[in-house]
Amino acid sequence: GLFSVLGSVAKHLLPHVVPVIAEKL
């Protein structure tokens, strides 16, 4: 369903987003 798609997208994006957020902190 839609949530499983969003979950897959989130798993792919998180590794890229987390370092960016960490740098800003």
UniProtKB/Swiss-Prot annotation:
Role of this protein: Shows significant activity against Gram-positive organisms, but is less effective against Gram-negative organisms.
User: Lineage of this protein's species?
Assistant: Eukaryota, Metazoa, Chordata, Craniata, Vertebrata
Leucine amide carried by residues: 25
Per the record, the major location class is secreted
Q: Which protein is depicted?
A: Caerin-1.18
Does the keyword section mention Secreted? yes
Query: One GO CC term of this entry?
Result: extracellular region
Q: Which organism is it from?
A: Ranoidea gracilenta (Dainty green tree frog)
Which family does the similarity line name? Belongs to the frog skin active peptide (FSAP) family. Caerin subfamily.
The GO biological-process annotations, alphabetized, read as: defense response to bacterium
Tissue specificity, please? Answer: Expressed by the skin dorsal glands.
Arranged from A to Z, the UniProt key words for this protein are: Amidation, Amphibian defense peptide, Antibiotic, Antimicrobial, Secreted
User: Where is this chain's protein located in or outside the cell?
Assistant: Secreted
Disulfide cross-links: none
